[in-house]
Amino acid sequence: MLNIAVLVSGGGTNLQALLDSEARGENPNGRITLVVASKPGVYALERAAKAGVEGCVVRRKDYPNSEEFDAALLDTLKNHHIDLVVLAGFLSVLGPSVIAAYPRRILNVHPALIPSFCGPGMYGLRPHEAALARGCKVTGATVHFVNEECDGGPILLQKAVDILPGDTPEVLQKRVMEQAEWKLLPKAVAMVCSGEIA
């Protein structure tokens, strides 16, 4: 049984998808034991509390540099015996020490079909705005392992989502979450926990 930490920065809709999947018994080889937020007061912490999962806050601005932030985050993960880290809308960049401590054990969900609309600055509505501005007919989501390159780790799963006439970035974001992110992320986590993906 792998202990899973989910790192969040906002409302936690992907966290909720993971919690719901776990409650349905879809990941018998892993359990979410910790939710780490990058700032206090985010709704994701309420979701964690409602599910009986411990939540804590590790804020980048509380540390003088990224190395000390990474050390604090790593201490938090190690103290909770975390085996697998899932980035679910976590907006702080993980440093080399965290990535090195969890090789092929950090997953991220990205709201586009990597290698399109990814990399530094491509988060939130921006990938959807970029897909619409480019005139794309499809977009989607990607779950990948995290390495030192932003959105550059090995891809585990992808799912395409149609872009429809009249879509706004907000409408497209909601469709990508519902049709791709909330399905792919729990599936990828279960596959890693079962050893199907190593």
Residue ranges and their predicted role:
Residues 1-43:
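N-terminal Rossmann-like dinucleotide-binding module
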Residues 28-68:
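Short, surface-exposed acidic-centric catalytic microdomains
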Residues 43, 72-73, 94:
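Short acidic active-site motifs
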Residues 68-74, 123-127:
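Charged helix-capping and loop-helix junction motifs
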Residues 76-83:
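Glycine-rich phosphate-binding loop signature in dinucleotide/nucleotide-binding domains
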Residues 84, 88-197:
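Donor/substrate-binding cores of folate-linked one-carbon enzymes
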